[in-house]
Amino acid sequence: TTIQNMSEILDEEHYGMFSVKDRFLDIFSRMLHNNQISSFAPILLHGPPGVGKTSFVSSVAKALHRKTFKIALGGLDDELELKGCSISYNKAQPGIIIRNVERLGTFSPVIHLDEIDKLGKISDASNIEGILLDMLDNDRTNFMDLYLDIPIDLSNAIFIATANNIE
């Protein structure tokens, strides 16, 4: 992966958006220069609906040669959907992160946290927000899925959140 290749993919798939593309390419170039493309700080893309945030996340994944999946936070109202449910419960299963990591076959996906701004509108979003903070922390090596009950290393995952409104 080179900056030129990334730039070509982003330019080919997104007309305009120059400041956003330049910012991402700046981040990529610093990470490549430091050989740290895996340790990527979480990023927030915000703007009105329909400007291309979701497709831009897909293009970033393509430019980095990574698989991607989306978590629709706007409709998420149960923390167990993120964190999984203990195996001792009936119909227990891993959380959405682990299910998708398993489905994609990689611990290095681009994870799209869609509509992160909608969390505040959920009646009991505080537990979900706490789980997200834990996942997005700089030390992402100890994410606990309740179903597996072992620490999961998410340090190679890239988290990109999108929001329509950040106020």
Model feature map: region roles:
Residues 2-46:
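Pre-Walker A (pre-P-loop) alpha-helix and adjacent loop at the N terminus of AAA/AAA+ ATPase modules
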Residues 36-73, 102-103:
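Walker A/P-loop
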Residues 38-41, 64, 83, 104-109, ...:
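Short loop/turn elements that form and flank the Walker-type P-loop nucleotide-binding site
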Residues 47, 84, 115:
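The Walker A (P-loop) glycine that initiates the GxxxxGKT/S ATP-binding motif of P-loop NTPases
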Residues 63-93, 100:
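AAA+/P-loop NTPase substrate/partner-engagement loops
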Residues 74-77, 88, 116-119, 164-167:
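Conserved nucleotide-binding/hydrolysis micro-motifs of P-loop NTPases
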Residues 88-112, 145-151:
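Conserved alpha-helical scaffold flanking the Walker A/P-loop in AAA+ ATPase domains
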Residues 112-153, 158:
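Conserved catalytic/switch belt of AAA+ P-loop NTPases
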